[in-house]
Amino acid sequence: MTTADVKVGIGVWDMHFPNHNQKLWENVLRVIGDIKPDFFVFGGDNLDMDAVNHWEIDKGNKRGMEGKRLRKAYDDYNSEIMDQFNGSLPDYCRKLWLKGNHELWLEQYIDKIPELEGFAEIERNVKLDGWELYDYRQTVKIGKIYFHHGEYTCKYHASKMADVFEKNMVIGHLHTLQVHTKVTPIDGEAHSVYSMPCACDMNPRYMKDKPSAWVNGFGVFYIMPNGNFNIYPVISSKDHFVFNGKYY
């Protein structure tokens, strides 16, 4: 086996567009240009979907919802992210777009207003030609890694995922870096769950300056022909990081 046989991928979780970290995103594009990935994963909560935020709608928070429009969110995401991004990836790159719980908000909204069915869905509005689209809670396997948005919100969420799924997984959802490994006593096989940092604004309006464990960053994955892998979470501190010996 040579280095050329190893597949490399990049994953971004919890972008929450338009409430994303633009500087981090620009640096991710630079990394893409440098390593030319074989696959790319948008890991869910790619769109914030704040125009259909059921928490604010159910509270009757008209001030918080003022000016939020789903059409504008789609148009801006396409022009500011997908148009630029699709031209940055190599033609051979496998592209995966996972839905997260924020994308699920839209389905919950359509449940209440079913007349929107067939018009408002992500697959009808986001430029996803050439992308594999996965619903919330679906997993996709590459090598021996299962990619998933994330499920639990407890303090030790990576441990919880390892206990329930018993697979090697990469998740997001909690906006922080966490790793847990579970080893079975039967044959010594290990399963690790990596919770990735987020690509969103670290202090959105609803956080109201509340302390958190959130960190910005993304993931880089190397997968060998037998499915074995190495996972490298990349943490961005004050909009900068070093990856593969290069300062971004």
Predicted segments, located by residue:
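N-terminal active-site segment of His-dependent metallophosphoesterases
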Residues: M1-M82, N244-Y248
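Flexible, charged surface loops at secondary-structure boundaries
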Residues: T3-A4, G33-K36, L89-D91, K127, ...
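Active-site metal-binding loops of divalent metal-dependent hydrolases
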Residues: W13-H16, G44-L47, N101-E103, G150-Y152, ...
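A short acidic (Asp/Glu
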Residues: N21-Q22, D50-H54, L106-D111, A158-S159, ...
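Hydrophobic/aromatic residues located in beta-strands of well-ordered beta-sheets
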Residues: F40, K95-W97, V193
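Active-site neighborhood of divalent metal-dependent phosphoester bond hydrolases
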Residues: V52-Y136
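Charge-rich, low-complexity terminal tails
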Residues: L98-H102, Q108-I110, V234-Y248
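Conserved beta-sheet core of the metallophosphoesterase superfamily
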Residues: K144-H240
